[in-house]
């Protein structure tokens, strides 16, 4: 296709046979600017001005066309780069999702076996997770994002608190009630912070006390729930066919059934909230976690209650439908509140994950944050609101 400059050049020439085309020189004659005394006009007129204007016009048009072609090529190059980046991002997300699913299944199966085993197996596994999670918590407290505006507790205090947190589930299994022990431990840690060298800070005390409560005391309620509620779930059908070598029907207690339903409710909340947010997510839930949406949260609530009702019908616990709905709502609330709490800590710390222990998932806290408050809510609900523990 001819360019605009070529069209202008072709139309500027006369092809009529009545006269021949004569090319005028582009160099101005020497006499073209000669003037007589008193005259304001030159003796000879030339078409140089008209020709110069035409040349400038054609040059500008040609340059504009070349620039336009260059811009088009540049835009195509940018689009090509963006397309490659989008493909790489999709492949990366698909790889991360695949890794999360593989490690999620690899972790979920052993955890299910640990919950079924109960007793010391469950308690020791929980204590190990608590120890690692508490170490991650105190590392978050010492990170640049949080430590920038406060003075973190000394490292020896953080290590002592991690050990105390790990001992809480074990002491709960042995003594049942550890309120006095936890209070005594918190008092000793507070004294150690107050008599340290230098200038003690309130931020050190508050972050340490919260660490003991968040990483140690709250997870201990899972031991109370799984091992403390030893009343048999008499109406559970699966208990009748359970092998005698594994405990028989007596193995299926209220604590075991409630723990399985709570774990399943937390998993359902995370799964349905993720799928609902991807499909319907429009309205942000909170600035703490920008990726969470109200639509995904509502879908997570519906999914959690639905799974709780289905499992309660299958396991015949609790007997009341209203109790099943209330239990599902508490599991949902504990899951969301625990997730947002850890998101707030990580946001202040300026990190994406609490650690890198689990590929594709982050640290221990990133996986158990939804369970931290749920155990306490589930245990309190069964102890205070269900007659005969819902049997």
Curated annotation (Swiss-Prot):
| Predominant place of localization | plastid
| Reactions this protein catalyses | a 1,2-diacyl-sn-glycero-3-phosphate + CTP + H(+) = a CDP-1,2-diacyl-sn-glycerol + diphosphate
- Provide the protein's localization: Plastid, Chloroplast membrane
Encoded by which gene? CDS4
Provide a Gene Ontology MF annotation, just one: phosphatidate cytidylyltransferase activity
Q: What is the lineage of its organism?
A: Eukaryota, Viridiplantae, Streptophyta, Embryophyta, Tracheophyta
Q: How is its activity regulated?
A: Highest activities is obtained at about 30 mM CTP and 2 mM phosphatidic acid (PA).
User: Could you list the residue ranges that cross the membrane?
Assistant: 102-122, 175-195, 202-222, 254-274, 298-318, 321-341
According to UniProt, the name of this protein is Phosphatidate cytidylyltransferase 4, chloroplastic
Pathways involved:
Phospholipid metabolism; CDP-diacylglycerol biosynthesis; CDP-diacylglycerol from sn-glycerol 3-phosphate: step 3/3
UniProt keyword terms in alphabetical order: Chloroplast, Lipid biosynthesis, Lipid metabolism, Magnesium, Membrane, Nucleotidyltransferase, Phospholipid biosynthesis, Phospholipid metabolism, Plastid, Transferase, Transit peptide, Transmembrane, Transmembrane helix
Cofactor names: Mg(2+)
- Topology term for the membrane: Multi-pass membrane protein
Listed GO CC annotations: chloroplast membrane; chloroplast thylakoid membrane; plastid
Write down how the cofactor binds this protein.
Requires a divalent cation for activity. Displays highest activities with MgCl(2).
Q: Which InterPro entries match?
A: PC_trans (IPR000374)
């Amino acid at each position: 296709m001819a360019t605009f400059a070529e069209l202008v050049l072709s139309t500027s020439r006369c092809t009529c046979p009545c006269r021949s085309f004569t090319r005028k020189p582009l160099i101005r004659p020497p006499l073209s600017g000669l003037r007589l005394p008193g005259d304001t006009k030159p003796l000879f007129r030339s078409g140089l001005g008209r020709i110069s204007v035409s040349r400038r016009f054609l040059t500008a048009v040609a340059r504009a066309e070349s620039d336009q072609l260059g811009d088009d090529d540049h835009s195509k190059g940018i689009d090509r780069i963006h397309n490659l980046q989008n493909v790489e991002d999709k492949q990366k997300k698909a790889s991360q999702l695949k890794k999360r699913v593989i490690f999620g299944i690899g972790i979920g199966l052993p955890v299910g076996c640990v919950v079924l085993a109960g007793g010391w197996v469950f308690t020791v596994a929980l204590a190990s997770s608590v120890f690692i999670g508490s170490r991650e918590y105190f590392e978050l407290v010492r990170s640049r994002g949080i430590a920038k505006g406060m003075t973190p507790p000394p490292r020896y205090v953080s290590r002592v608190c991690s050990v105390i947190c790990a001992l809480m589930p074990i002491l709960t299994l042995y003594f049942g009630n550890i309120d006095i022990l936890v209070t005594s431990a918190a008092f000793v840690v507070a004294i150690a912070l107050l008599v340290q060298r230098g200038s003690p800070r309130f931020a050190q005390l508050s972050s340490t006390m919260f660490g003991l409560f968040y990483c140690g005391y709250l997870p201990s309620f899972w031991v109370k729930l799984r091992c403390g509620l030893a009343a048999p779930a008499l109406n559970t059908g699966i208990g009748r066919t359970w092998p005698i070598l594994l405990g028989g029907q007596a193995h299926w207690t209220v604590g075991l059934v409630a723990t399985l339903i709570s774990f399943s409710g937390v998993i359902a909340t995370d799964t349905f909230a993720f799928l609902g947010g991807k499909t319907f997510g429009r309205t942000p839930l909170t600035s703490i976690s920008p990726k969470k949406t109200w639509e995904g949260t509502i879908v997570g609530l519906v999914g959690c209650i639905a799974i709780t009702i289905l499992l309660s019908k299958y396991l015949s616990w609790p007997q009341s439908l209203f109790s099943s709905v209330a239990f599902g709502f508490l599991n949902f609330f504990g899951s969301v509140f625990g997730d947002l709490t850890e998101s707030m800590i990580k946001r202040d710390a300026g990190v994406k994950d609490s650690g890198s222990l689990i590929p594709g998932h982050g640290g221990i806290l990133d996986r158990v944050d939804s369970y931290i408050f749920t155990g306490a809510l589930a245990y309190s609900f069964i102890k205070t609101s269900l007659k005969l523990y819902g049997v």
